[in-house]
Design a protein with these regions (language model features):
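A short glycine-rich, aromatic-capped structural motif
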Residues: 1-52, 72-75, 144-145, 152
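Functional-site microenvironments in short loops/helix caps that host divalent-cation chemistry
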Residues: 2-6, 50-223, 230-232
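Non-catalytic surface loops within mature trypsin-like serine protease
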Residues: 3, 21, 30, 110, ...
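Short, surface-exposed beta-strand/loop micro-motifs that present aromatic residues
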Residues: 15-16, 25, 137-139, 227-228
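Residues within well-ordered beta-strands of beta-sheet-rich folds
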Residues: 23-25, 83, 237-239
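Short, structured beta-strand segments at or near domain termini in extracellular proteins/domains
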Residues: 231-242
């Protein structure tokens, strides 16, 4: 897990993780699947008002039945998965599904992305499973591009640097927000003095998105946002214990 070369600081160092058995959905959650949860009056109806929608062609460009649900928050993603008797994936589980055991750079291997393998560098999502050439080592689809996928874990920029049994385990909300503020003050890992001081724990997302370039699709790449954020490029896929 992680990367020693070609990654961001929060991906260092590469390290081995042992996981219990788990299941991960083959595809991202679709609009039509999420709407069944809305109809059951469990999930929140989609809100078309978003500051990022018009930039990419308006809400209608993202709402076909088989496109992945987007503009969904971490809390809403968690509610949906729990409705199905599932849960959000953990960061290590997601990376295992995307990389297998050979530390590949992308789900399909180490070759650079192209249009047959991922939905990226564009202006809208595509139907889930539309890039079978980009399948991961266990057959999962769209793990590089389409939408970022919310994960259970709190984002901790220092998690991989811990030693022993604590490696990879995020700290408490208070510890993590303090660490992020330190990075903000130092201008490290993409933070600058103008970045706002965190006011809530951020959660991890993985997998790249339709509007990201090729390097952003690396399977070890870690992205993070506050759990309440609804971004046009954020979606979900569910997991459950094995």
């Amino acid at each position: 897990m992680g990367a020693d070369k070609g990654g961001q600081e929060d991906e260092h160092p590469a390290h081995q993780v042992t996981l219990a058995a788990f299941w991960l959905d083959k595809t991202e959650v679709t609009n039509e699947a999420y709407e069944r949860c809305v109809a059951a009056k469990v999930c929140r109806p989609h809100d078309p008002k978003s500051s990022q929608l018009n930039k990419f062609g308006g809400d209608e460009a993202f709402r076909a039945p088989r496109q992945p649900i987007s503009s969904i928050s971490w809390e809403e993603s968690k509610t949906y998965c729990q409705w199905l008797g599932k849960r959000l994936p953990r960061e290590a589980e997601w990376e295992k599904a995307a990389r297998g055991t050979d530390a590949r750079r992308y789900p399909w291997g180490n070759d650079p992305p192209d249009a047959t393998r991922g939905v990226y560098a564009g202006s809208r999502t595509a139907e889930v499973g539309s890039r079978p050439a980009g399948a991961g080592p266990y057959g999962h689809l769209d793990m590089a591009g389409n939408v970022w996928e919310w994960l259970e874990d709190i984002y901790d920029p220092y998690a991989y640097r811990r030693v022993g049994a604590d490696r990879g385990i995020p700290g408490s909300c208070e510890e993590v927000m303090t660490a992020q503020n330190e990075l903000r003050q130092k201008g490290q890992q993409g933070y600058t003095g103008s970045n706002p001081i965190p006011t809530e724990c951020e959660r991890n997302l993985r997998g790249g998105a339709f509007n990201y370039d090729g390097p952003g699709l690396r399977s070890s790449n870690r992205v993070h946002h506050p759990a309440s954020f609804r971004l046009i490029m954020s979606g979900v896929r569910c997991a459950k214990d094995g």
